[in-house]
Swiss-Prot record:
Primarily expressed in spleen, heart, lung and intestine and, at lower levels, in kidney, stomach and muscle. Expressed in thymus and lymph nodes (at protein level). In the spleen, expressed in periarteriolar lymphatic sheets. Isoform 2: Expressed at higher levels in T lymphocytes compared to isoform 1. GTP binds at residues 51-59, 72, 169-171, 206. The keyword DNA repair does not apply. Residues 319-326 are lumenal. One of its GO terms (molecular function) is GTP binding. One of its GO terms (cellular component) is lysosomal membrane. The gene is Gimap5. This is GTPase IMAP family member 5. The chain crosses the membrane at residues 298-318. GO terms for biological process: myeloid dendritic cell differentiation; negative regulation of apoptotic process; negative regulation of lipid catabolic process; negative regulation of nitric oxide biosynthetic process; negative regulation of T cell activation; negative regulation of type II interferon production; positive regulation of calcium ion transport into cytosol; positive regulation of CD4-positive, CD25-positive, alpha-beta regulatory T cell differentiation. It is linked to Diabetes-prone biobreeding (DP-BB) rats have a frameshift mutation in Gimap5, which results in a truncated protein in which the C-terminal 215 amino acids, including the membrane anchor, are replaced by 19 other amino acids. These animals exhibit life-long T-cell lymphopenia, including lack of regulatory T cells, and spontaneously develop insulin-dependent diabetes resembling human type 1 diabetes. PROSITE patterns: G_AIG1. Belongs to the TRAFAC class TrmE-Era-EngA-EngB-Septin-like GTPase superfamily. AIG1/Toc34/Toc159-like paraseptin GTPase family. IAN subfamily.
């Protein structure tokens, strides 16, 4: 017989913990229930919003939650200053949406950024089921591409297996379908991103309400369900998420020494993942260079063959011409 009471208590406890952490208190995991609490048991879905600053992550989070939970303004600058998590439900299932501060900018990692990244890990531990890469329709820029690279650096290169591209400003499609837009885009960086994400994408009009809002959320959740089935219910994890869980079980506050060690671990793991990303990119470049070289060798061989055939034909014609005059 299923213990629905424990499941409900676990969900409420997690909700309380999330609200405590949102207020900036790291000492939010009490020994009561936390050692036995399992996110998997409660069926809680963890959704992490990623993307460059000002891309509309907070507004997208509000659309998913169907309420103004995150501060959002109509401007191209980030409003979110620290990680924030909010609970919602869809068709009877609880989910957690984590909004992120500007940690995906191409800048030098400092102590404040270590803290922002560490808190983000704390929010979505033991790992997100899905990462939503938020970008504006028709505005995928170099900054967006750099933000994607930072996502890989912060969460590891394997994170793309759990990513869905979410385009904002769906209303700008007009009579064109999203499939047509993505298929015929001339933006090579966007094309590469969509392929890397397994062609998982959808679009939101964050001004929508009522049935339109419900419809686009249903489309997103259908994508999420397929992604979960593909991974058999697993979520993205790495060494830092494992270490984060160990830290959480201690129930330490941000003013205690273990929290400083935790931030040191955050920096070390992000640096390690950065090196792994660079190695992967180097390997990819080497393979591309090899392919180009192979293509060049093939073209050279064909060119030489054509030259030889041409010279042979020319010599034959000359001999025939000389033979006629003898």
């Amino acid at each position: 017989m299923e213990d629905h009471g424990f499941e409900e208590l676990s969900t409420r406890t997690h909700d309380l913990n999330v609200r405590r952490l949102t207020k900036g208190n790291i000492n939010f995991l009490l020994s009561t229930g936390q050692e036995t609490y399992s996110v998997e048991d409660s069926g809680l879905l963890r959704i992490l919003l990623v993307g460059k600053s000002g891309c509309g992550k907070s507004a997208t989070g509000n659309s998913i939650l169907r309420r103004p939970a995150f501060e959002s303004r109509l401007r191209g600058q980030s409003v979110t200053r620290t990680s924030q998590a909010e609970m919602g439900t869809w068709e009877g299932r609880s989910f957690l949406v984590v909004d992120t501060p500007p940690i995906f900018e191409s800048k030098i990692q400092n102590q404040d950024m270590d803290k922002d990244i560490g808190n983000c890990y704390l929010m979505c531990a033991p790992g997100p089921h899905v990462l939503l890469l938020v970008t504006q329709l028709g505005r995928y820029t170099v900054e967006d591409a750099m933000a994607v690279r930072m996502v890989k650096q912060i969460f590891g290169v394997g994170v793309m297996r759990y990513m869905i591209v979410l385009f904002t400003h769906k209303e700008d499609l007009a009579d064109e379908s999203l499939e047509e837009f993505v298929t015929h885009t001339g933006n090579l960086d966007l094309h590469r991103l969509v392929q890397e994400c397994g062609r998982r994408y959808c679009a939101f009009n964050n001004k929508a309400s009522g049935e339109e809002q419900q419809g686009q959320l249903a489309e997103l959740m259908a994508l999420v369900r397929r992604l979960e089935q593909e991974h058999e219910g697993s979520f993205h994890s790495n060494d830092l998420f494992v270490y984060t869980q160990v830290f959480l079980r201690g129930g330490y506050s941000e003013h205690q020494e273990p929290y400083k060690f935790y931030l040191t671990k955050v920096r070390q793991e992000v640096e390690k993942q950065k090196r792994e990303l660079e190695e992967q990119e180097g390997s990819w470049m080497a393979k591309m260079l090899c392919r180009v070289t192979s293509c060049l060798d093939w073209h050279i061989a064909v060119s030489v063959l054509l030259i030889v055939l041409g010279l042979t034909l020319l010599i034959t014609l000359i001999n025939m011409y000389i033979g006629r005059w003898k």
